[in-house]
């Protein structure tokens, strides 16, 4: 059984569990996703960028035929991070095809979310204007995260990553979250 948006949209709990979005939030996203997809994949050009000689739409129809299905595929991947083989099984694709769709759709999803203005800023100087754009004045929670990572083998990379202290090497992030809406406003570079 293939996971399809038309069946999933009727089940509020499953949609939220698989995508992290409510129906109302999901309805807003396809138009922005469609616009971002059209900039990456215009209908009058082929995959390599040359002008199309034949009309678009010929050939076998893909499993991810609609914009909503492509969006659902990328949101399920982002929310659950399953193995690509499992994701392929859920959507009726092979593992290699699932990998290709992931590589193709994630930048489009990021662009669509950025166009809607819901991505957190990653530049500290732009945080204040970014928050003023949302017209909300609320308490902000500032938190730091630290994730251990393996020590690089390359001496040049070791020097860049090392703080000089004898402790495990780790990546650090600072996160600023609006306490009322739980919206991430700022996420530092890793």
PLM-predicted stretches and their roles:
Residues 31, 35-42, 79-82, 107, ...:
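Short helix-loop boundary/capping segments at the starts of domains
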Residues 1-62:
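Charged, often Cys/His-bearing segments associated with DNA-binding zinc-finger transcription factors
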Residues 66-82:
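Short, amphipathic alpha-helical "recognition" segments used to contact nucleic acids or chromatin
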Residues 60-68, 163:
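Structural motif
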Residues 83-190:
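Short, well-ordered secondary-structure "scaffold" segments embedded in the functional core
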Residues 18, 62-65, 75-76, 91-94:
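Short secondary-structure transition/capping motifs
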Residues 56-61, 74, 126-129, 172:
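Short, charged beta->alpha transition segments
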């Amino acid at each position: 059984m293939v996971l399809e948006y038309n069946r999933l949209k009727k089940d509020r709990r499953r949609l939220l569990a698989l995508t992290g979005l409510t129906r109302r939030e999901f309805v807003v996203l396809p138009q922005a996703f469609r616009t971002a997809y059209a900039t990456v994949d215009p209908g009058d050009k082929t995959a390599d960028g040359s002008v199309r000689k034949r009309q678009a739409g010929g050939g076998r129809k893909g499993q991810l035929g609609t914009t909503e299905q492509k969006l659902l595929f990328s949101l399920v991947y982002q929310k659950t991070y399953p193995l690509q083989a499992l994701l392929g099984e859920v959507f009726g694709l092979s593992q290699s095809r699932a990998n290709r769709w992931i590589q193709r759709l994630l930048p489009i999803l990021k662009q669509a979310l950025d166009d809607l203005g819901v991505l957190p800023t990653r530049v500290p100087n732009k945080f204040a204007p970014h928050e003023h754009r949302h017209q909300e004045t609320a308490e902000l929670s500032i938190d730091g995260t630290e994730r251990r990572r393996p020590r690089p083998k390359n001496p040049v990379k070791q020097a860049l990553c090392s703080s000089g202290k004898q402790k495990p090497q780790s990546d650090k992030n600072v996160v600023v979250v609006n306490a009322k809406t739980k919206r991430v406003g700022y996420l530092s570079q890793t």
